[in-house]
């Protein structure tokens, strides 16, 4: 395949054109007064979004060199979204600003490598300053404010996320689903829930809810199929004498064993319920062990030399209450020791750090949540499907932002934190003039998020930025109301992690682009003139009439 090459300024200008076009589309969404972008879909209704990364992902150019520039900045937005969950528009605006200022310096004859070193030094200094300014995000009010800002000033979303986090804890799993009504709804599952229901409907003891409810039950965990009742006789006799109910969690319960359990349950000899173990393969073994630790029981497994015939009441776990429905089993208040549960959580966390698979990481996070707190489901309500998609995306963004805030704390929002972090650059000096220029490029670039927020709100950016820079601490400009004041008191907060990741990712990609000297792309294929020859053959069709 033949290639096309571009060098020096020509290459950088083409790249810059792509970056500018992409940034123009993304930056209109920034701030409380940012606008929507409508994205065409190959089928169905178009998507309306105010999410920077959704806009960036849709953009591709026919011009190959422009497209390269756009794709590199798209990477900035995606990486920021993946690691911090928000701040994609901020990252795009910062990347464009660093690139534009840097390109001017390179065109003026400065050394791109020294500019890059200067930018890197400045990013390090600003990052340290941001972390020093960061305040922990502990209370529900701060969490709600972070969620509100991330969801484009939608207070209902901020409030429901704060409520969900309060109920399931910082470690709990919060999932977002489509709702049925117009309002957002929150449902919380306390304790450990897994998606396996009763094996037989004859175990139901609450006809109203079609569920089996067991108060203060024993829990028998078996890592195999149970088909013979003989294996379980000693355990069943012990449970019957104690007068407490029994939940059996096994790979499967079938045949004679299931029939005997059902008959005993219906006659009231032993109050019992059987469910299949959650998961498959190694994950099933791990989840059975999780349940064992949560309920202070033992998994009966031949792998560790424990047989069902030899099981005693000491091997059984217990809980305050268990509810089994057709589809789910919920264990409430297992009697496991807190120290053992915490050790198990730490062990799963270590596995999360090591795994490279996103799917495995998600499943491990679910296991942590089930052990640590519970699961909350936010059902997003909307009038139309188009609104539902847009709102759901905002809820997910806000959720990521609040998690980031809990992780690394919060700073003043609206671009104020970056303006304050400029002070870290006052005493910073590079090894030469070109590095000093790199530091100045970043000094100017970190004003760009505030400038863009102010511009989108219809105010004069330079006036606002200068006024904010004259003051200190959290003093800033509320673009939603047009007022100046303490950003934290006004509830305008940004997660430190989001601001930090946006800056680091933007500087990383922009400085790479500045040091580019050559670009290589495939030459577009030339269409061969086959059409004319084919059409010529069609002329012979006229003679067909004579053949009839």
From Swiss-Prot:
Keyword Nucleotide-binding annotated: yes
Catalytic activity: ATP + H2O + a folded polypeptide = ADP + phosphate + an unfolded polypeptide
Any Gene Ontology CC annotation: cytoplasm
Main location: cytoplasm
Keyword Amino-acid biosynthesis: no
Matches recorded under Gene3D superfamilies: GroEL, GroEL-like equatorial domain, TCP-1-like chaperonin intermediate domain
GO molecular function, one term: unfolded protein binding
Transmembrane spans: none
Binding residue positions for ATP: 29-32, 50, 86-90, 414, 478-480, 494
CDD domains: GroEL (cd03344)
Any single biological process term in GO: protein refolding
EC number(s) given by UniProt: 5.6.1.7
Family: Belongs to the chaperonin (HSP60) family.
Xref: NCBIfam families: GroEL, PRK00013.1, PRK12849.1, PRK12850.1, PRK12851.1
HAMAP family, alphabetized: CH60
Known function: Together with its co-chaperonin GroES, plays an essential role in assisting protein folding. The GroEL-GroES system forms a nano-cage that allows encapsulation of the non-native substrate proteins and provides a physical environment optimized to promote and accelerate protein folding.
Subunit field text: Forms a cylinder of 14 subunits composed of two heptameric rings stacked back-to-back. Interacts with the co-chaperonin GroES.
Protein name per Swiss-Prot or TrEMBL: Chaperonin GroEL
Underlying gene: groEL
């Amino acid at each position: 395949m033949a290639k096309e090459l571009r060098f020096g300024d020509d290459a950088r200008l083409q790249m810059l054109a792509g970056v500018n076009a992409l940034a123009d589309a993304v930056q209109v969404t920034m701030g409380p007064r940012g606008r929507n972008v409508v994205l065409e879909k190959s089928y169905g209704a178009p998507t309306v979004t105010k999410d920077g990364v959704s806009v960036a992902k849709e953009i591709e150019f026919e011009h190959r060199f422009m497209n390269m520039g756009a794709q590199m900045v798209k990477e900035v937005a995606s990486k920021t979204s993946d690691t911090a969950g928000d701040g994609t528009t901020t990252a795009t605006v910062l990347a464009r600003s660093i690139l534009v200022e840097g390109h001017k310096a390179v065109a003026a004859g400065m050394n791109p490598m020294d500019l890059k070193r200067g930018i890197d030094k400045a990013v390090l200094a600003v990052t340290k300053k941001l972390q020093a300014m960061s305040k922990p995000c502990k209370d529900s009010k701060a969490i709600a404010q972070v969620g509100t800002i991330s969801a484009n000033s939608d207070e209902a979303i901020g409030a429901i996320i704060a409520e969900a986090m309060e109920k399931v804890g910082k470690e709990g799993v919060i999932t977002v689903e489509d709702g049925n009504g117009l309002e957002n709804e929150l449902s919380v599952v306390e304790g450990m829930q897994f998606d396996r229901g009763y094996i037989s409907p004859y175990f139901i003891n609450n006809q109203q809810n079609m569920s089996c409810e067991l108060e203060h039950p024993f829990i028998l965990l078996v890592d195999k199929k149970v088909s013979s009742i003989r294996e379980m006789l000693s355990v069943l006799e012990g449970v019957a004498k104690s007068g407490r109910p029994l939940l059996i969690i096994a790979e499967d319960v079938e045949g004679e064993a299931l029939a005997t359990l059902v008959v005993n349950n219906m006659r009231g000899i032993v109050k019992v319920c059987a469910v299949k173990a959650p998961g498959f393969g190694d994950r099933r073994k791990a989840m059975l062990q999780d349940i064992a630790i949560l309920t202070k029981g033992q998994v009966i497994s031949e792998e560790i030399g424990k047989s069902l015939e030899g099981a005693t009441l000491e091997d059984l776990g217990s809980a305050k209450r268990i509810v089994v429905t057709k589809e789910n089993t919920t264990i409430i208040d297992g009697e496991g020791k807190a120290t053992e549960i915490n050790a198990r959580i730490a062990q799963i966390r270590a596995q999360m750090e090591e795994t490279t698979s996103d799917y495995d990481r998600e499943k491990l996070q679910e296991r942590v949540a089930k052990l640590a707190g519970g699961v909350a489901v936010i059902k997003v309500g909307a009038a139309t499907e188009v609104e539902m998609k847009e709102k759901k995306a905002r809820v997910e963004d806000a959720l990521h932002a609040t998690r980031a805030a809990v992780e690394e704390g919060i700073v003043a929002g609206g671009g104020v934190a970056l303006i304050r972090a400029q002070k870290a650059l006052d005493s910073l000096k590079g090894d030469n003039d070109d590095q000093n220029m790199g530091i100045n490029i970043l000094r100017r670039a970190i004003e760009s998020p505030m400038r863009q927020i102010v511009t989108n709100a219809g105010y004069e950016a330079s006036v606002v930025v200068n006024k904010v820079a004259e003051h200190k601490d959290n003093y800033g400009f509320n673009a939603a109301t047009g007022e100046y004041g303490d950003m934290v008191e006004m509830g305008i907060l940004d997660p430190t992690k989001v601001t930090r990741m946006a800056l680091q990712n933007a500087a990383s990609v922009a400085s790479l682009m500045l040091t580019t000297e050559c670009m290589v792309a495939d030459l577009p294929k030339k269409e061969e003139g086959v059409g004319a020859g084919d059409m010529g053959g069609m002329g012979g069709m006229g003679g067909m009439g004579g053949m009839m």
